[in-house]
């Protein structure tokens, strides 16, 4: 066992070999490296699978041995302090390592086929492997300095991955937006780390936890500066807020969908957004002893839960809908951390990671099947209003996507049901208001997830549809409403152009079929070997190399929730997660959460309540988008109902219009940032530039010009005779003395 721990440092460096070898190959023998480019997927998957086996072995030893292992090397040593680096193996490290390795391996297998026609295939696998290296290095870090180094590497990888298709302007803008937004959080994290070092004199987690735990009474008695400690903890949390897309630094997450779909799956399941959650989990023993910080964490979490769910309601891009879903689910995890439910937070991190990876890879399979028909423009191939009726074309993708959807909705016995219900149960004990918001959001989650599922897989394929006002399909808008006569035309589907300055119009215009855009094909040709791809009249199922990861993730989504189920007294040995979490330096303050007496009656009551809310959301989604709506439409019941209750209909349309505009325009938060912050900063910069150029430089230039002209005037007065110089000097001195005399005596 000791030998296994001794070689644990190799975990992050195994996958580093792939980007190094690809880089050397492209530098030294580029033709040969490119000719065997598909072979590079094998070492990428192989090395990450070794990491997975190694992490699994560590986890088994953690569960059986309840041990923590830390090894440090001194980096710099002086009389006052020393800077060390090394690795820390505890339950949190092993959990995150397995999560990163399993999700990363599935994504790499999937990507081999998904990216096979892309010119950036080698660059893609280099980015992905380095992404995994950075995240694995982050989770084994034993101190804040090492965490910050790998934290920045994770941010760099996300920047490169989001802007993978950098020739596309939207992708270039998205990676810059993600980079700048995360700069805010990273700067806060750096200041927080330096502040903690100023207080405690150490970067090591163990030292920080011991110092702050021993100083609880001192903080209350103002022996330590509690205000400064609160400021430092808030700055640390700011880094997690930006990385995990929490309000108000969440704005980068939907734009990050400009990258390839496998990268989106990795970012949302196991790397980028998981980094912020990991940081909060690692620092939780420290954050709990600092006043008000836990309240701040839970408040930000519950705001993000609700905001992410509302912003997902009206999105038409399938990946952006999933992005806002990720934001909301991360809010649940942050809420659990803020209320001290460490176990529930990690449990939901595990279940959500596999469910969300399944959904993102499923969406990639859908996009992959739609691209030959619609072209390679994300505005079309990712747009749900062009989909529909895909069940018969992509049945395996449909089945796995439905499984992930049900899991995220919290339907038993799937994975997310167990973890989300534990968070809801604990939130009732902490704050009824937070619990009501979190419970209500489960209904919104079920609504927007089934809205996504129904728009994508149910109904008819809308890409080949010719607009006809007599057709029932013509009248279905993104909200499931009728368009032509009875219902408000303001809710008809938006045009495919994302430019919000353009007028709203129906995508099912009469006698019009959308064709593949030549400009779009030309744009994508920078990234692919083939300028044009063979077109198909209908979508087709993905290849086996893409379906295999979907099936494995579906199995994990079915059964991974069992690791955290509390079976009650007498069978607590089956509660694997609680036993797993015991050997953790982050668990010293949370033993009360590890071995509770599970009350199945109370659990069943809460579960029935939450599942009922979820089923209500599913029912509403079916009424608006499913076969129930079509049946009502064929029986003409909606029109007759609307004629009787016209005023109610008008009011409901107006209310839905407000909700739609709020959701589609991202809550106007991006607009606020663009108007207030961006323009304000630019205005301040222009004012500063004017002051510097006209005032500061003007005074300096004026002095120089004045000296120049004075010198020129004196030059013409000089004749080269010493007697003249003496005369002018004595005359000036006489005048000065006369003036002084009159000033003193008169």
UniProtKB/Swiss-Prot annotation:
Protein name, entry field: NAD(P)H-quinone oxidoreductase subunit 5, chloroplastic
TM stretches of this protein: 9-29, 39-59, 89-109, 125-145, 147-167, 185-205, 222-242, 261-281, 283-303, 330-350, 357-377, 399-419, 428-448, 545-565, 608-628, 726-746
Species of the source: Amborella trichopoda
Oligomeric and partner information: NDH is composed of at least 16 different subunits, 5 of which are encoded in the nucleus.
GO cellular component terms listed in the entry, alphabetical order: chloroplast thylakoid membrane
A single MF term (Gene Ontology): quinone binding
Catalytic activity: a plastoquinone + NADH + (n+1) H(+)(in) = a plastoquinol + NAD(+) + n H(+)(out); a plastoquinone + NADPH + (n+1) H(+)(in) = a plastoquinol + NADP(+) + n H(+)(out)
GO biological process: ATP synthesis coupled electron transport; electron transport coupled proton transport
Membrane topology classification: Multi-pass membrane protein
EC number: 7.1.1.-
Nucleotidyltransferase in keyword set: no
